[in-house]
Regions:
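Conserved serine/cysteine hydrolase catalytic core
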Residues: 172-230, 235-238
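Active-site glycine-rich loops that stabilize anionic/oxyanionic intermediates
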Residues: 16, 24-27, 91
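Active-site loop/oxyanion-hole signature of alpha/beta-hydrolase fold enzymes
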Residues: 6, 11-13, 37-40, 46-88, ...
Length: 279
């Protein structure tokens, strides 16, 4: 139980240095499961349903801005109580990780920010609003739901679609499947994503790496380059064969990025500001 939020639902796997994984908007902790399974031999992986998402309740403070989400992550990192925690965030989760790292460097060892940067185009946020607030809100059965998710996320492998269907929806009284993510919370969250992230990235004092999917239409190459120019000291990775949903589409590459980054925390990397691509 955190001071500002409802009780956070979490899944955990493995033993070792702690990693706290933060999902994107409308998603849930289970999108991280393949990455967690790849890292569990060396790390204590914790993934949460963030406020208003999944099986986590609505926050008592009713807030869905960057600071509120970041406080949850930072407070949970401190609660884990095994020294500073590395945050691994995707999309909304990456934004929250950057803000938390800037807010609480005492609790955060480092930040892996996947598919969220400053300078994202307004058109990308408008398209996100349409996807999140539009579309059907209930489904007659699992087949209908799976078909919809496969259409909405064409790049996701079948196992990722199945996890989203199984862990992001529940049956209501009439038997129809509805999202666990609260509709009002999602609208407020999408509005909050438009906050200017540049000041937080500029003052982020803990080690970090910026990650983009090579085919992403959310974080454009121009936006990513601008973020890298803002912080030329930070390493950057472009993951080939992935669009926005890098952790679900390329879990092996994400696990490799996490291992390399965590190794750099233990032993400083030789070349800051290095930008590389994976195939």
């Amino acid at each position: 139980m955190l001071a500002s939020a409802a009780e956070l639902y979490a899944i955990e796997l493995g033993e070792g240095p702690p990693l706290l994984m933060l999902h994107g908007v409308t998603a849930n902790a289970y999108i991280w499961l393949p990455v967690m399974e790849l890292l569990a031999d060396s790390y204590h992986c914790v993934a949460i349903d963030q406020r208003g998402h999944g099986r986590t309740g609505m926050p008592r403070d009713g807030q869905f801005d960057a600071a509120a989400y970041a406080r949850d992550a930072a407070d949970l990192a401190a609660f884990i109580g095994r020294g500073p925690v590395t945050l691994v965030g995707h999309s909304l989760g990456a934004r929250n990780a950057i803000v938390a790292g800037a807010m609480r460097p005492d609790a955060i060892a480092g930040v892996i920010a996947i598919e969220f940067t400053p300078f994202i185009d307004k058109a990308a946020f408008d398209a996100l609003d349409t996807r999140v607030t539009g579309g059907p809100r209930s489904f007659g059965d699992l087949g209908d739901l799976t078909g919809y998710l496969s259409w909405r996320y064409p790049g996701l492998p079948p196992d990722a679609v199945s996890r989203r269907a199984s862990h992001g929806y529940a049956a209501r009284a009439d038997g129809r499947l509805v999202p666990l993510a609260d509709a009002g919370a999602m609208r407020a969250t999408c509005a909050g994503l438009r906050e200017d992230l540049a000041p937080d990235l500029r003052r982020l004092g803990v080690p970090a790496v910026l990650v983009r999917g090579a085919d992403s239409r959310f974080v454009s190459d121009q936006a990513f380059r601008a973020a890298c120019a803002l912080r030329p000291d930070l390493p950057a990775v472009v993951v080939g064969g992935a669009d926005h949903y890098v952790p679900e589409e390329r879990p092996e590459e994400v696990a490799e990025i996490v291992r390399a980054f965590a190794a750099g925390l233990a032993e400083p990397a030789a070349t800051p500001g290095n930008r590389r691509s994976t195939s």
